[in-house]
């Protein structure tokens, strides 16, 4: 028989039937690598907009495979089977927060009346999938009214109106509020805790953010109140204690200078509370009493004091600045003297410069608040207090998902040694830097 040869480099184009068989083989390989639960989880969380069609194909593969496992191959005679194929019907699955149409297979019982439910189809219609995906999109900047516009295949799919999206967001965000309120902190030491408040439509949200021994930032809790008062702050801190927060070890509490926060921290931590007043807030408070022409000189003098490595030298610099302010405006001098020593706590502890910049201000928690404010900026009407807390928590948790370790985290052991000296009663040498 004569052999057939082809020229080097030439090829024969595969037929449509061969291409379909090849694609089916690849799809089958995907199915063998992942079990149904893993594939459903991948669809609900990891399919991006450009891969929606791929997600639908995998969904069809899941459904067809379940039918084949339960009914056997098409036209195969299986005496012991309990269900049989019953055609197809238009249905819906939720993939990455989108309601998408699909021609789903149907099966029915052979020994009794009624249609059998496909487990994979029920999982792909999970009610938990839509709220979580809606929550992620809303906190990224998609409003309830515009949500339909970003859903792929909306022209072919099922209706997604602002009411259903809003209900999904309420459900998902309420779940996140509960999870945050139930976080446990047993066995975790937070040597540094930031406490601050922010206004949301006439209500105040008090937030606590902790830094672990290895420099990781974690959101601790949120409490809502009419104002930033001591009762609300104390309630937040006592709630954290009830969830395992350790108050028996010295803790550096970074505050913005509000007397209510100061009083609550002292009440809960007692002698273990070491207060660091935010240097940025102190500077702004003093500037409010001065004409703008004096602001550059004030900034220069405060920077020189706050960047000093010796506590006594830094304190002397602030006292010199206070005397200079006395000649300009006595109220400005009084503002600087109020809590002046507490703005130098990190200097007194001998914290290295890189970590000191992180601990000297409330910038870490202010940054989280800025993300939350960006998320809530699209809200046109605040209906109730629960809505404020849900939106604020959603924004703060989005900020937490992007947290990185604080700058200077390698110096955290030095800070821990300095704080622990207070427990032993040895105190700190104001002129000594912790090694």
Show the residue positions of the predicted features.
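RNase H-like nuclease fold core
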Residues: 2-13, 36, 75-76, 83-88, ...
């Amino acid at each position: 028989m004569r052999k057939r040869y082809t020229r080097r480099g030439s090829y024969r184009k595969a037929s449509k039937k061969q291409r379909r068989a090849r694609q089916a083989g690849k799809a089958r390989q995907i199915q063998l690598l992942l079990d149904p639960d893993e594939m459903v989880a991948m669809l609900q969380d990891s399919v991006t907009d450009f891969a929606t069609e791929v997600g639908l194909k995998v969904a069809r593969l899941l459904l067809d495979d379940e039918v084949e496992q339960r009914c056997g191959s098409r036209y195969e005679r299986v005496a012991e089977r309990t269900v049989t194929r019953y055609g197809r019907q238009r249905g819906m699955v939720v993939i990455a927060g989108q309601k998408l149409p699909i021609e789903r297979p149907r099966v029915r019982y052979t020994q009794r009346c009624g249609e059998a439910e496909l487990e994979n189809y029920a999982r792909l219609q999970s009610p938990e999938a839509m709220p979580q995906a809606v929550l992620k999109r809303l906190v990224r900047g998609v409003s309830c009214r515009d949500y339909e516009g970003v859903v792929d295949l909306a022209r072919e799919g099922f209706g997604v109106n602002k009411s259903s999206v809003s209900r999904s967001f309420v459900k998902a965000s309420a779940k996140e509020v509960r999870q945050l309120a139930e976080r446990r902190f047993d066995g975790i030491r937070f040597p540094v805790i930031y406490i601050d408040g922010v206004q949301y439509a006439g209500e105040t949200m008090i937030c606590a953010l902790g830094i672990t021994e290895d420099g990781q930032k974690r959101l601790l809790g949120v409490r809502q109140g009419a104002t930033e008062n001591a009762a609300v702050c104390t309630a937040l801190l006592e709630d954290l204690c009830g969830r395992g927060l350790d108050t028996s070890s010295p803790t550096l509490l970074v505050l913005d200078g509000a007397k209510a926060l100061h009083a609550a921290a002292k009440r809960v931590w007692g002698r273990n509370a070491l207060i660091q007043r935010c240097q940025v807030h102190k500077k702004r408070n003093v500037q409010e009493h001065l004409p703008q022409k004096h602001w550059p000189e004030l900034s220069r003098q405060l920077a020189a004091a706050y960047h000093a490595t010796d506590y006594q030298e830094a304190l002397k610099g602030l006292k010199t600045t206070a005397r200079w302010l006395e000649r300009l405006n006595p109220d400005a001098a009084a503002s600087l003297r109020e809590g002046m020593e507490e703005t130098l706590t990190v200097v007194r502890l001998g914290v290295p410069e890189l970590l000191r910049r992180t601990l000297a201000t409330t910038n870490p928690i202010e940054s989280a608040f800025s993300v939350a404010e960006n998320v809530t900026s699209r809200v046109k009407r605040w209906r109730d207090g629960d809505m404020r807390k849900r939106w604020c928590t959603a924004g703060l948790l989005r900020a937490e998902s992007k947290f990185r370790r604080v700058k200077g985290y390698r110096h955290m052991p030095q800070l821990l040694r300095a704080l622990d000296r207070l427990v032993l009663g040895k105190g700190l040498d104001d002129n000594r830097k912790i090694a």
